[in-house]
Amino acid sequence: NEPYRKTKLSGATEFPEEVRNYMEVIHYTDRCIGAFVDSLRSNGLYDNTVIAIASDHNQLLSPCGVPGYNDTEAAFIVANAGVKYTHTSVMGQIDIYPTLLDVMNCNDYAWKGLGYSILRTPVGSAAGWNGTVYGNEGDSLASRQIEAWDISEKIITKGYFSLK
């Protein structure tokens, strides 16, 4: 991915080119996030800002150092929120919005999304776009998570939010 700048990582010939490129992208991303946080601090915004980082897929190195694409695992990081919590179970992207509302104490919103806040509900499963349930397939939320994909698809494709 561009526009990262080559660093000494690019010349580390003990690693395959694909691994070096991956490390360059990670380095570039880390620098950009650092610059963003520095900008928040220098403009006096940091103390009143919740930083949320989410991905739509995962591009991790396997234990053998081989890059691989994974669309069932993704990062979700919330920083500077005043809440310390580590979620080690499965959750879906659909749970991000309600979780962020919870983190920011915006619980008076009329619409809380289609998922669940991981701070309030023990989410142990997530549904994929194709109806596959990840995590605990017997989770009581699983059928609703599958239904939420259908609702989400209809909202997006049927112009639910379009202006008339």
Predicted features along the sequence, with ranges:
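Membrane-interface soluble catalytic domains
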Residues: 42, 82-164
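Active-site lining segments that contact anionic ligands and/or coordinate catalytic metals
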Residues: 48-49, 71-74, 124
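Structural recognition of the beta-strand scaffold that forms the well-ordered cores
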Residues: 52-53, 77-78, 126-127
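Feature representing long, continuous alpha-helical segments
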Residues: 20, 24-27, 31-35, 74-76, ...
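Active-site His/acidic residue clusters
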Residues: 1-25, 62, 66-70
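Flexible glycine/proline-enriched surface loops and loop-helix/loop-strand junctions
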Residues: 17-18, 79-84
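Metal-dependent active-site segment of extracytoplasmic phospho-/sulfohydrolases and closely related
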Residues: 28-68, 101-104
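Solvent-exposed loop/turn segments at secondary-structure junctions
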Residues: 1-3, 57-61, 82-83, 124
